[in-house]
Design a protein with these regions (language model features):
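Phosphate-binding/switch loop-helix module in NTP-utilizing enzymes
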Residues: 1-28
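Conserved NTP phosphate-binding and transfer environment spanning the P-loop NTPase/kinase superfamily
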Residues: 24-160
Length: 160
């Protein structure tokens, strides 16, 4: 993300390993009944009828599942709770602000209110993933509040 596409290094040949990272990688859609109740103020005030929740869930159950089917080995870095995800994302914003201050650009830095609103967009699926993905992942690294691995559970060994 930080470099122009024309500066990216090229790769030739056949990859042995491709690592893909994402908040909702491997997530499955929620049951319709789980979408009925808003999980935060954003959903309550701006998606009271659940139209966005339903749309996002339908997308997650469609083309994303076809893409996720290509994953040979799913590894989950599991935060202790959504509260910790919020705290870590806040810390990330503080570090970004400090780096931006040094470079003289504060473009894209969120204040506390903006960050809270940003996180509300992802709260439902983050909570869902924290609950459901440990039962689906091939390996789970349980992180503590300080980002350290507190436990590691292997369900399926990585392909050779």
């Amino acid at each position: 993300d930080l470099f122009a596409v024309d500066t990216w290094p090229g790769f030739g040949g056949r990859a042995v390993l491709i690592i893909i990272e994402g908040w909702f990688l491997g997530a499955e859609p929620q049951l319709d009944s789980e979408l009925e109740t808003a999980v935060n103020a954003l959903e309550e005030n701006e998606d009271g009828e659940g139209l966005w929740r339903g749309y996002a869930n339908a997308q997650l159950g469609g083309s994303y599942q076809r893409w996720f089917a290509y994953i040979d080995h799913l590894i989950l870095l599991k935060a202790p709770a959504f509260k910790q995800v919020k705290s870590w994302r806040s810390l990330q914003e503080v570090k970004l602000a400090a780096r931006s201050k040094r470079s003289g650009s504060s473009r894209g830095i969120m204040n506390g209110e903006q960050l809270e609103r940003f996180l509300e967009h992802f709260e439902r699926l983050t909570r869902h993933c924290l609950q459901s993905l440990p039962g689906k992942a091939d390996q789970v690294f349980y992180l503590d509040a300080d980002h350290q691995v507190a436990n590691h559970h292997v369900i399926k060994n990585a392909p050779a």
